[in-house]
From Swiss-Prot:
Protein name: Light-independent protochlorophyllide reductase subunit N
Annotated pathway: Porphyrin-containing compound metabolism; bacteriochlorophyll biosynthesis (light-independent)
Cofactor(s) listed: [4Fe-4S] cluster
Record EC number: 1.3.7.7
Pfam families: Oxidored_nitro (PF00148)
């Protein structure tokens, strides 16, 4: 059911400021254990991947960069067959994801044709658009899941099960399966699954339960092409969102459950964090597309969410989250200069922001939190409640623990000539 929301979304005019979408390789190659991610890019892409993921080449990770050289400019598309054969011999993957980057996109490389040429019945090579020209940091996972979805088996009519949509670590996934079973909800699996050959069956009686707020396109694709029903509810982040998620999912299977006591207990467990968050002015700048559910959690935790901005807001997919943000300023594609002026004027207690703006804001005396960390940490469901709350309070506690600049603690033990 589509949630009606009276919350006004202010649409501004700025380009997306987000970390490179290629970084999604960092969590997806670990999740899909028989995959290989091949990025067609430049030396800049290779430098980013090696440094951002903290992986040296001798570790033989299941990802790599095929470098675009000057000679490739005169070709229809780069010659990758020898590299594919090398990957097959070294890693024995079940699937290879061919990821685009900015330079090949500008060169107009025909990735669809290239992936078809490289694919075999035994080893599909799937094109994944991930260029930072078009996609935010987290949206490349959406592209990967769209490519995978065509290989999901067709579920039989009447086989009503839930398929959880979105990459979460194995321990959290086990918690979701256990919770579903405790509520009497049959589980069809996860997309993505741990192995390419274990993809869940999806059909017209399947309930798709999105776990991440940046998967609107693949959810729509599964609804249109398979007839599956997409659960429209809050995302399972925080006690409030987790309760709503499970109650609404149970209702899809004809089960009425009341998890109010469970939610209350979860809030009680994080009271030391919510006490610190109460009344704190917080600004979330656009980066990961997780800003809406994070703002909803902060609002219900007692914080004053001064602004929640996001690169992209889907009124249907994000409807329940928008409805919960009554009284919060919500901005889509925020104007960067206006936002910086407002932050300087408001002087919020915490700014959740991208890597690009974190250090400059910290240099102006603001307390900042890297927004990309929320994509990488296990913060979903009941088991992730404490980790989620702690991510907001940790920078506040760190700041409170620092002595003032004129405190002797900073110069203790330093030679007199250095002071």
């Amino acid at each position: 059911m589509l949630s009606k929301s009276s919350v006004e979304v202010i649409r501004e005019d700025n380009a997306t400021h987000s970390f490179c979408g290629l970084a999604s390789v960092g969590w997806l190659y670990q999740k899909i254990k028989d995959s290989f991610f091949l990025i067609l890019g430049t030396h800049t892409c290779a430098h980013l991947i090696q440094n951002a993921l903290g992986m040296m080449i001798f570790a033989r990770p299941r990802f790599g960069v095929a470098l675009v050289e000057e000679e490739d400019l005169s070709k229809e598309h780069p010659q990758l067959k020898p590299l594919i054969e090398e990957i097959k011999a070294d890693h024995h993957p079940s699937v290879i994801f061919l990821m685009s980057s900015c330079t090949p996109e500008v060169m107009k490389v025909d990735f669809d044709a290239l992936s078809r040429e490289l694919s075999t019945p035994e080893l599909p090579v799937l094109f994944v658009p991930a260029s930072g020209l078009d996609y935010a940091f987290s949206q490349s996972e959406d592209s990967v899941l769209q490519a995978l979805s065509m290989f999901c088996p067709e579920a039989e009519a009447g086989d009503k099960k839930v398929v959880f949509l979105g990459s979460i670590n194995d321990a959290v996934a086990d918690d979701f399966v256990a919770e579903a079973e405790a509520l009497g909800i049959p589980v069809g699996g996860f997309l993505p699954s741990n192995h390419f050959n274990d993809l869940p069956a999806i059909g017209k009686d399947t309930i798709i339960a999105p776990l991440q707020p940046y998967l609107a396109k693949v959810a729509t694709k599964l609804s249109r092409e398979r007839g599956a029903k997409v659960l429209t509810t809050q995302f399972p982040l925080g006690p409030d969102g987790t309760r709503k998620f499970w109650e609404d999912l149970a209702a899809e299977f004809g089960k009425k459950v009341d998890l109010s006591a469970r939610e209350k207990a979860a809030w009680e467990r994080i009271k030391e964090h919510t006490d610190l968050l109460k009344g704190k002015k917080i600004v979330l700048t656009a980066d990961t597309l997780m800003e809406l559910p994070l703002s909803r959690f902060l609002k219900n935790a007692g914080a004053d969410v001064v602004e929640c901005s996001s690169s992209y807001i889907n009124r249907r997919f994000h409807g329940p989250e928008l409805a919960a943000l009554e009284g919060v300023k919500v901005v889509e594609q925020p104007n960067f200069n206006r936002q910086l002026r407002d932050i300087e004027s408001i002087r919020p207690d915490l700014v959740v922001t991208s890597l690009m703006t974190a250090n400059p804001l910290a240099g102006q005396g603001h307390i900042v939190k890297w927004s990309m960390e929320f994509v990488l940490m296990p913060i979903h469901g009941w088991s992730g409640v404490n980790a989620l709350a702690a991510m907001f309070t940790r920078p506040l506690r760190r700041k409170a623990a620092l002595p003032p600049m004129d405190d002797p603690a900073w110069t203790a033990g330093i030679m007199p000539s250095a002071t």
